[in-house]
Structure formats: structure tokens, C-alpha cells
């Protein structure tokens, strides 16, 4: 496991694939500013996810067939497709892992929202893309990430 950014963790490459995960409960607890609004927190989390994704792209730019895969309830399908991801059916093993981690998901979502929040497991999607398709969409990813960072800077000034 490797931190690609504050809230994005990647597994070691295996069978030409890297699986990505959101940060841990400790990451959320110790990183999120207690005085930040829910919107600021969500923008920071999304910004860091994209920053981590861009770091993976930069680190593996020569392996165009390398696949990146992850499951989330945070990213909507339309945005994921703009970034070069395809939607895949979440496999049963991954769904069971998410169900077992549901208390942790409640805590991380609640930290982000600044109130008790329950993730909807029906909204979980698995996204997959290779480095080539992500590189083709890198400008879009950077544009979204920069907009989130600008929004954070504006809110903190």
C-alpha cells in the first residue's frame, strides 16, 4: 500500500493492475480541519483523490496498458467517464468487503459531511481505466482538480 496523496491509497501493481482506495478513518480524522465546512471538506477529499490519480499517471506514464480500478460511492458515473473511466459491475467479493467496512464508511462519510451520514451501498460503482485512456483525459482531470483547489483557496481566504 502506498499513499498517492492525502486521501488516495494504491495497492502494489499486480497482474498489470493497480487497485485504489480512499484514505483511512485516521486520515480523515487527523487531516480534516474541524473548522472547515462540509463543502470544504468534500472538495479537499475530491481534490486529493484527483491529485493522487495524477500522481499515479505520472509514475506509470510509460505503461499505457496498466489498469487502475477502484470502487466508490463518491464519484458519479458522468464525471468518471469524462476522466476516462468505464463503469464495471462491482464484484461480489468487493461488495462483501464494503459491507464489512460499512461502520468505517459511516465514520468517514460523517467526518466529511460534519454530521451523521450513511453511504448508500446502491450508489457504489466500480470504475476501471488504463493509463492510456486516463492520459487522454489528463487535461480534464487537472481542470477539475484545479477548480477544486481554487475553490478551497477562495473559501480559506
Where are the model-predicted features located?
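Terminal substrate-recognition subdomain of acyl/acetyltransferases
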Residues: 1-12, 67-157
Amino acid at each position: 500500500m502506498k499513499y498517492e496523496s492525502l486521501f488516495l491509497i494504491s495497492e502494489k501493481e499486480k497482474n498489470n493492475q493497480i487497485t485504489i482506495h480512499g484514505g483511512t478513518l485516521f486520515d480523515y480524522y487527523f487531516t480534516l480541519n474541524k473548522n472547515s465546512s462540509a463543502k470544504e471538506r468534500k472538495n479537499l477529499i475530491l481534490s486529493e483523490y484527483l491529485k493522487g490519480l495524477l500522481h499515479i499517471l505520472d509514475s506509470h506514464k510509460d505503461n499505457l496498458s496498466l489498469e487502475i480500478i477502484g470502487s466508490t460511492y463518491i464519484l458519479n458515473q458522468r464525471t468518471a467517464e469524462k476522466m476516462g473511466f468505464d463503469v464495471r459491475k462491482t464484484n461480489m467479493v468487493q461488495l462483501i468487503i464494503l459491507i464489512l467496512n460499512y461502520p468505517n464508511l459511516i465514520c468517514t462519510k460523517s467526518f466529511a459531511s460534519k454530521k451523521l451520514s450513511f453511504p448508500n451501498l446502491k450508489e457504489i460503482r466500480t470504475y476501471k481505466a488504463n493509463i492510456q485512456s486516463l492520459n487522454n483525459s489528463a487535461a480534464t482531470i487537472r481542470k477539475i482538480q484545479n477548480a477544486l483547489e481554487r475553490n478551497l483557496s477562495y473559501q480559506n481566504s
